[in-house]
Amino acid sequence: MTKESLEKATFAGGCFWCMVKPFDTQPGIEKVVSGYTGGHTVNPTYKEVCSGTTGHTEAVEITFDPAVFPYEKLVEVYWQQTDPTDAAGQFVDRGDSYRPVIFYHNEEQRQIAEKSKAALDASGRFKKPVVTEIAKAETFYPAEEYHQDFYKKEKAHYEGYQVASGRAAFIDANWKG
């Protein structure tokens, strides 16, 4: 994997703590950074983003090798971490800072995301329409260090949150099997 061959992908799917591990454990992923994007405040803090005044959403920025793990596969992994029918947040986390968004970095990513969204919507997997936003990637601001790799640093807290938030049960009911 050379630096020249790497690309970026950015996904928002509720609490960013829960969005790192599913990507971080895939082949061809160089790094996954938790952060904020899509808003108007420069270098926002976690507290500011949670206040709902910045316009940002919690997201992960993934640096990946498309020859090893193509963008299409990243989008598949993304869908399986989210409730794509809920535009007002994800699971217990509500509000714009937790809204589901696929942020595309180029036209190819936009087309892949749009096609994948349409296919998921047409699949009949969900009774409600797929409402995940697809938007142009903007400046990404890394979150504070204590948020990075949370699933590794705070394993028990992370696993408890996955269950308590309702995310784990939703994934089991809608994406497994």
From Swiss-Prot:
Q: GO terms for biological process?
A: protein modification process
Q: Which EC main class describes this enzyme?
A: oxidoreductase
The answer to whether the entry has keyword Translocase is no
What EC number(s) would the UniProt record show? 1.8.4.11
- Key words of the record: Oxidoreductase
Reactions catalysed, semicolon-separated, are: L-methionyl-[protein] + [thioredoxin]-disulfide + H2O = L-methionyl-(S)-S-oxide-[protein] + [thioredoxin]-dithiol; [thioredoxin]-disulfide + L-methionine + H2O = L-methionine (S)-S-oxide + [thioredoxin]-dithiol
The record, for InterPro entries, names: Met_Sox_Rdtase_MsrA_dom, Met_Sox_Rdtase_MsrA_sf
For this chain, one GO molecular function annotation is:
peptide-methionine (S)-S-oxide reductase activity
Give the positions the UniProt entry annotates as the active site.
Answer: 15
As for what it does, the entry says: Has an important function as a repair enzyme for proteins that have been inactivated by oxidation. Catalyzes the reversible oxidation-reduction of methionine sulfoxide in proteins to methionine.
Q: Which NCBIfam families would you find in this protein's record?
A: msrA
Q: What is this protein called?
A: Peptide methionine sulfoxide reductase MsrA
The encoding gene: msrA
